[in-house]
Amino acid sequence: MNEAIFVPQSIFKVAGKGLVVSGSLKSGVLRPGMMAEIKKQKINILGIEAFNKKIEEVKGTDSAAKLLGIILPESAEKVLIASVNQEIIFKESK
């Protein structure tokens, strides 16, 4: 099972997109549809962008992994604020 470790740094609400979390990917491969559980709330990645372009996957070794924005549901805002600068492990959904 693929796992990716993402460290969120900033959280923004973007009209027409939802919640955009910028940060860096420390390891693994991150794809839309992957899921994390933070404080018993499941969070699903809706999309990934880097350098203003949608991307289907990013690896921890890619240059885009350092300036990454992941799009998440707005319902995740409260748990993400508490998780800024902490590692979040995303896994492939089953």
Language model features with spans:
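Beta-strand/loop-dominated core regions that host nucleotide or nucleotide-derived cofactor-binding catalytic loops
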Residues: 2-15, 24-26, 37-94
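Residue-level signal for inorganic ion chemistry
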Residues: 33
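Structural beta-strand segments of beta-rich domains
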Residues: 19-21
